[in-house]
């Protein structure tokens, strides 16, 4: 199950988003609802999520500032979606700058959330596949370089790669 954090200062809208679609049917679990960006940051310091749905205008900390803080401080690599009543291109432009996954205008329609659920699920799968491929490639390089070292054919590249991947004790 992918974990979802809702961030909205209007409880009725947050609840509406949580019941508009059957999140579990699509492989999602809403793990928490925060009333503003600051509450969301506190939650993210101790919990990981895969998707954040946040309003733009909220007291204390708005959605754009939340997104910016998350990205700059590397608090989460969750997919981030802005839910806004503002069609102003300036907000969308700022959101794109900080790698926002999507920008949905209110009132949120059921089909929009369904499409979003499918889109994020596909993006998540692609990211996980890429991560696995990268780990496998790294492991293959490591084995290749270790073999070269064990066979007595060390080169500078092999030594640097292996020493970068291993911790040697200095006793």
What do the PLM-derived regions correspond to, one by one?
Residues 8, 55:
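Active-site residues of response regulator receiver
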Residues 11-32, 46:
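Two-component/phosphorelay signaling modules centered on CheY-like receiver
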Residues 33-42, 63-65:
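Helix N-cap/capping motif at the beta->alpha junctions
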Residues 52, 80, 95, 103-104:
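Two-component signal transduction core modules
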Residues 58:
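Receiver (REC) domain active-site loop signature in two-component systems and cognate sites
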Residues 65, 76, 87-102:
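Alpha4 helix (beta4-alpha4-beta5 surface) of REC/receiver domains from two-component response regulators
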Residues 96, 102, 108-171:
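Interdomain helical linkers/hinges and coiled-coil/dimerization scaffolds
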């Amino acid at each position: 199950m992918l974990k979802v954090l809702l961030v909205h200062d209007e409880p009725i809208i947050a609840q509406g988003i949580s019941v508009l679609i059957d999140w579990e049917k699509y492989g999602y679990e809403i793990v928490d609802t925060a009333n503003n960006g600051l509450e969301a940051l506190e939650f993210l310091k101790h919990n990981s999520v895969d998707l954040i749905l946040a309003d733009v205008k909220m007291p204390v900390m708005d959605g754009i500032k939340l997104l910016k803080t998350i990205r700059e401080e590397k608090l989460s690599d969750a997919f981030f979606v802005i839910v806004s009543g503002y069609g102003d291109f300036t907000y969308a432009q700022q959101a794109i700058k900080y790698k926002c996954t999507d920008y949905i205008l209110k009132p949120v329609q059921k089909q929009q959330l369904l499409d979003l659920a499918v889109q994020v699920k596909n993006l998540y799968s692609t990211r996980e596949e890429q991560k696995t491929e990268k780990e496998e490639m790294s492991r293959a390089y490591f084995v290749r370089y270790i073999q070269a070292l064990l066979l007595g054919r060390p080169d500078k590249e092999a030594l640097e790669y292996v020493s970068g991947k291993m911790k040697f004790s200095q006793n």
